[in-house]
Amino acid sequence: LWWLYRDNLLPKPTKFCGYARSKLTTADIRKACEKFMKVQPHEQQRYEEFWELNHYVSGSYDGRLGFEMLQQQMEIMENKGVANRVFYLALPPSVFNSVTVRIKEICLSKKGWNRVIIEKPFGRDDVTSKQLSDHLASLFDEEQIYRIDHYLG
């Protein structure tokens, strides 16, 4: 994301909000990422701007409270404007169903479009892949769903 932001390849204004079970802060994430970012001295100001656009919410994958906190954070970030939301799910397949249900119930943008990107193995086999596809189809329109499967092909 840093490289996309650095190179002006993201629409303006783009903001980022991470969500996971880990009890972290944005500062913790920044510190863990530093060695991978390859920031040049002349990019330092832009790098600081990038981190000002980042937020993080910690919560469970199956309860409502964390997703309600995520929704509140995204609303604060949007500042009452129209916002499109991209939910990028790099999760174990075992939690896809609960997470996507909570996103649908609680976290969708009411004023912009929504997209859900599913990364990782898309199921364990043909049967579980179809089950996941059917589940997603019950929640989202096909044009809202993007699948990235490292094992396809």
From Swiss-Prot:
A GO biological process held by the record: glucose metabolic process
Taxonomy, superkingdom: Eukaryota
Source organism of this protein record: Sarcophaga bullata
Family of this protein: Belongs to the glucose-6-phosphate dehydrogenase family.
Main subcellular localisation: cytoplasm
Function: Cytosolic glucose-6-phosphate dehydrogenase that catalyzes the first and rate-limiting step of the oxidative branch within the pentose phosphate pathway/shunt, an alternative route to glycolysis for the dissimilation of carbohydrates and a major source of reducing power and metabolic intermediates for fatty acid and nucleic acid biosynthetic processes.
Pfam families noted in UniProt: G6PD_N (PF00479)
List of residues binding NADP(+): 21, 120
Its EC number(s): 1.1.1.49
Keyword Cytoplasm recorded: yes
GO MF: glucose-6-phosphate dehydrogenase activity; NADP binding
Binding-site residues for D-glucose 6-phosphate, renumbered to this chain: 120
One CC-aspect GO term: cytosol
InterPro entries: G6P_DH, G6P_DH_NAD-bd, NAD(P)-bd_dom_sf
Subcellular location: Cytoplasm, Cytosol
Enzyme class: oxidoreductase
The protein, known as: Glucose-6-phosphate 1-dehydrogenase
Keyword check for Cell membrane: no
Gene that this polypeptide is encoded by: ZW
Pathway: Carbohydrate degradation; pentose phosphate pathway; D-ribulose 5-phosphate from D-glucose 6-phosphate (oxidative stage): step 1/3
Keywords, ordered alphabetically: Carbohydrate metabolism, Cytoplasm, Glucose metabolism, NADP, Oxidoreductase
Reaction(s) catalysed by this chain's protein: D-glucose 6-phosphate + NADP(+) = 6-phospho-D-glucono-1,5-lactone + NADPH + H(+)
